[in-house]
UniProtKB/Swiss-Prot annotation:
Species assigned in the record: Geobacter sp. (strain M21)
Cofactor: Mg(2+)
Family stated for the protein in its record: Belongs to the P-Pant transferase superfamily. AcpS family.
Keywords, in A-Z order: Cytoplasm, Fatty acid biosynthesis, Fatty acid metabolism, Lipid biosynthesis, Lipid metabolism, Magnesium, Metal-binding, Transferase
Function comment: Transfers the 4'-phosphopantetheine moiety from coenzyme A to a Ser of acyl-carrier-protein.
Reactions it catalyzes: apo-[ACP] + CoA = holo-[ACP] + adenosine 3',5'-bisphosphate + H(+)
Principal EC category: transferase
Keyword Lipid metabolism: yes
The protein, known as: Holo-[acyl-carrier-protein] synthase
Gene: acpS
Molecular function, one GO term: holo-[acyl-carrier-protein] synthase activity
Length: 125
């Protein structure tokens, strides 16, 4: 049974601007070291950062908590499986709330076009 859905859309230009400004503190606050390493290694790194940010926002919307109840940005991490499919790994408080809600599955879809990055998360019991 579906527990919640979340969708978020982000302008990639916002992350291009953050990169140009050298706003490392912002990236360190939102993204895990693995996410930073992955995104920084890509030709269009702003696009990859925007997608990961949208994924985290989408998860928070699907869970219904937003960024409160002790959840931090780094409690969620976007990773790719062997075939490149994005998945959301949960840690600490995000994982705890996921389990408390009796959830068993988290589905993530990412896409980008026309300067925007979009993510959708479906949480299932």
């Amino acid at each position: 049974m579906i527990y919640g859905t979340g969708v978020d859309i982000v302008e990639i230009a916002r992350f291009e601007k953050f990169l140009q400004q050298g706003n490392d503190a912002l990236f360190d606050r939102i993204f895990t070291p693995s996410e930073i390493e992955y995104c920084s290694s890509k030709k269009h790194s702003a696009q990859h950062y925007a997608l990961r940010f949208a994924a985290k926002e989408s998860f928070l919307k699907a869970l219904g908590t937003g960024l409160r109840d002790g959840i931090s940005w780094k409690d969620m991490e976007v990773v790719n499986d062997q075939l490149g499919k994005p998945e959301l790994k949960l840690y600490r408080r995000a994982e705890e709330l996921f389990r408390q809600a009796g959830l068993g599955a988290c589905f993530l879809s990412l896409s980008h076009d026309a300067g925007c990055a979009v993510a959708m998360v479906v949480l299932e019991r």
